[in-house]
Amino acid sequence: MEKCYTDVTEFAIPNSTHKLYLSPVLDGFNSEIIAYNLSTSPNLEQVKSMLDQAFSEDHYTNTILHSDQGWQYQHQYYHHFLEDKGIQPSMSRKGNSPDNGMMESFFGILKSEMFYGYEKMFHSLEQLEQAIVDYIDYYNNKLIKVKLKGLISVQYRTKSFV
């Protein structure tokens, strides 16, 4: 059974009263970000959009989707959506972020490579949003991963299904 991971992380830049929230889904097979949503509010609409994008097709049936115990993942809509798609929800133990280590690791890599120390370079949330979009493209299509035998996430998936 395949396993995917999800969570929400927050970005704040100086000189802005607003924040940006990233809600991705990471495929545990090849560490690819298969879907994500960026929003100025971590609300249910953000999670709905991310779920629709990630699981529009049936090839994730019988997958486990792991998350923390955030309110979004306890919501009735979330559980009904997963049930309708044949996806099994899984949640971390309360206050135990290592349970969602793959997602937390992605957030750590993302923030250390393109955000921490660079916050002042972003003069608007739009600039930050574009930088995140560009980084996710880089992460999926250009970043070589040792755990994938020196391949890129998309290459590893493609090679595995040939």
Ranges and model annotations:
Residues 1-24, 48-49, 60-62:
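Mobile-element integrase/transposase regions
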Residues 83-87, 111-162:
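C-terminal domain-tail junction helix/linker
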Residues 1, 22, 43, 47, ...:
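Hydrophobic (often cysteine-bearing) scaffold residues that line and stabilize catalytic clefts
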Residues 67-69, 75-76, 89-111, 126-129, ...:
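RNase H-like two-metal-ion nuclease catalytic core shared by retroviral integrases
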Residues 32-36, 90-92, 116-118:
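Short small-residue beta-strand/loop micro-motif enriched in glycine and branched aliphatics
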Residues 7, 25, 31, 51, ...:
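Mobile genetic element proteins and their domesticated derivatives, centered on retroelements
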Residues 17-18, 74-76:
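Catalytic cores and conserved motifs of cyclic dinucleotide signaling enzymes
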Residues 18, 36-58:
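Active-site beta-loop-alpha junctions of metal-dependent nucleic acid enzymes
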